[in-house]
């Protein structure tokens, strides 16, 4: 799979570069509020057929495609589709064969913003972990591929630092201590 971004409709924005003796403006593309944003496509190239298909993520074109993951059998691609305001996420499943939309597994909404930073982690062919701050803390949620929330994995108010993996029905991760000065290693079933 590959990601293609078109910024041709985005306004140029100057950033002052003062790293050299004489400063100069570096021009970047920056989508100012109320102006056009970049547009993205996600494509899948099939080496056997030498053909490319594009994932049908739908409208609007000004959206963010993030946390892209392959399914365990390589038949599906999962994408967190985030609106431009970054306050509404749809976690969608698409066909890797023809690019068609299959279903929305779940949605996350916030009055402030949704910040999807971590891709899904499959722990079996039909269950996966999703990491989210939807309860105000960085937490793990166990879902099945039908989109059903099986459970919130952590009952305590953890601020997860790193996810290390899954083995023998256990999730391994580290989180900051309550005072924020230390890090604890955890194993949760």
Model-based region annotation:
Residues 46-50, 96-99, 144-148, 189:
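Short loop/turn segments that connect beta-strands within beta-propeller blades
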Residues 2-54:
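Predominantly five- to eight-bladed beta-propeller fold
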């Amino acid at each position: 799979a590959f990601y293609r971004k078109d910024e041709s409709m985005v306004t140029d924005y100057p950033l002052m570069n003062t790293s050299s003796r004489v400063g100069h403006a570096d021009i970047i593309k920056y989508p100012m509020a109320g102006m056009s944003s970049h547009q993205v496509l996600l494509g899948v190239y099939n080496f056997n057929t030498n053909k490319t298909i594009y994932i049908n993520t739908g409208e609007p074109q000004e959206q963010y495609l993030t946390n892209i993951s392959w399914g365990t059998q390589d038949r599906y691609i999962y994408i967190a589709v985030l609106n431009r305001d970054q306050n509404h996420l749809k976690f969608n499943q698409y066909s890797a064969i023809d690019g068609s939309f299959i279903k929305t597994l779940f949605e996350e909404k916030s009055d402030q913003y949704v910040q999807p930073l971590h891709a899904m982690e499959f722990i079996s062919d039909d269950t996966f972990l999703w990491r989210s701050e939807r309860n105000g803390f960085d937490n793990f949620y166990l879902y099945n591929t039908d989109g059903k929330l099986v459970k919130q994995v952590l009952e305590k108010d953890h601020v997860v630092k790193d996810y290390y993996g899954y083995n023998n029905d256990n999730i391994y991760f580290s989180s900051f201590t309550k005072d924020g000065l230390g890090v604890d290693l955890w194993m949760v079933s």
